[in-house]
Amino acid sequence: VADQPHSDRWIILIAYLTGLSIGVHLLNLLCLPAIVLVYYYKKTPNATAKGSLIALLGSMVLVAAVLYGIVPGIVKVGGWFELLFVNGLGMSFNSGVVVYIILLAAALIWGVYESYTEKNKARMAISFILTIALLGIPFYGHGASSIIIGILVIAALGLYLAPSVQAKIKERWRITARTMNTALLCTMMIVIGYSSYALIVIRSTANTPMDQNSPEDIFTLGEYLSREQYGTRPLFYGPAFSSKVALDVKDGYCIPRQSEAGSKFVRKEKTSPDEKDSYIELPGRVEYEYAQNMFFPRMYSSSHAPLYKQWVDIKGHDVPYDQCGEMVMVNIPNQWENIKFFFSYQLNFMYWRYFMWNFAGRQNDIQGSGEIEHGNWITGIPFIDNLLVGNQELLPQDLKNNKGHNVFYCLPLILGLIGLFWQAYHSQRGIQQFWVVFFLFLTKPLHNPVNEITRMLVRSTPLPSG
């Protein structure tokens, strides 16, 4: 199928399904690395490890283009048009968004037409760059920096796609009309799939009883899509649960240090029916800045401090803290304790345990908080279970006879590992299939970055309260 004429239509179908999946769950984007590997192995019979790594890097760029580019970019550029037409030209609400949608559709159609006919390489490049710009892909970040980054990216892309430059570079690095046409069609399908979010605006406009964030315009839709109601969590760098807010002395008073995350636009309430529609700018989300920070903070919530200590024997280390001119010592977890909690709770208890329930066995279906008698994974093999959770024969009858109790003696796990290694070392095609499945299911390392962007998914797994 991959070598047949018009086989690119399957790639375009995948792009459409990707656009639809954005409206379901952004973690669906993590299928793209596996799909790119399938494409690479189909197109390259003598695939190499180097080529596989390059394909994976390309897939990461693809994921980033959708996650950091198209998803927030459409809302961002649409917001610029909305401000121009409503605040600048005095038109009604959503008029700028309507114009933006029309221009985006026209640019996509023009780009597909130019890349299909190949009549003029300059027009083909211009239509492609215009489409990318209207999608907001180059405008990464917030505020003026996003505009500067966008201009630089557009300029670099324009220089690279210039017909004179394309004629001089090596053939393998040229962007062919077919590649550009396929890219534009895929982008069009992603946008069509992504447009399923229009239902959110339509539903909110009807003022239904459940109307969270009330996303009735492009700006409130942006807040809804970024899940601002769920707040933020430190991912790569931030405070620990015992960190103190940084203090500044101003006019003889201690003032907590705060940072403002941009600004937002909201509809202005009319004082009379004759007043024109307009948006007003309000301060964005205000967050406290902390004096003690660490890399990859897993134990960050001050309200869960006692529960953290149930999982890790926290000794910590003392860090000096300027409390308005008075130096005091603050004890925060060290990096090893932080990583230990990550492995013992977030990976082992909240990830590996669920996995082993299905491939080794389950003790019972009682919600556990780390106790040896509630909800652990077991094998059914006594000497292994004794090492993991103690002698199961000593449990009371109500736990032994729990309906959630299942033991598989690790047979599914053993059979899976046998199949995995057989597939990996059976042939070249087998090792290719192995890596495809590996990257399709091994998405845990990518969960945290994607979850932080969506702000709705599980970022730092919440601790049980019981």
Regions found by a protein language model. Name each.
Residues 204-421:
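Lumenal/periplasmic acceptor-binding loop at the mouth of the active site in multi-pass
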Residues 176-201:
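Internal/C-terminal transmembrane anchor helices
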Residues 104-116, 164, 168, 409-429:
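Hydrophobic, aromatic-rich transmembrane alpha-helices
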Residues 151-152, 455-466:
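Hydrophobic/aromatic-rich transmembrane helices and adjacent perimembrane loops
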Residues 126-134, 189-192, 408-415, 427-449:
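Transmembrane alpha-helix segments characteristic
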Residues 1-10, 37-48, 109-119, 159-163:
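Membrane-interface transmembrane helices that cradle and orient dolichyl/undecaprenyl
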Residues 3-19, 48-61, 120-132:
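Short hydrophobic alpha-helices at membrane interfaces in multi-pass membrane enzymes
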Residues 27-39, 72-75, 147-153:
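Transmembrane-embedded, aromatic-rich helix segments that form part
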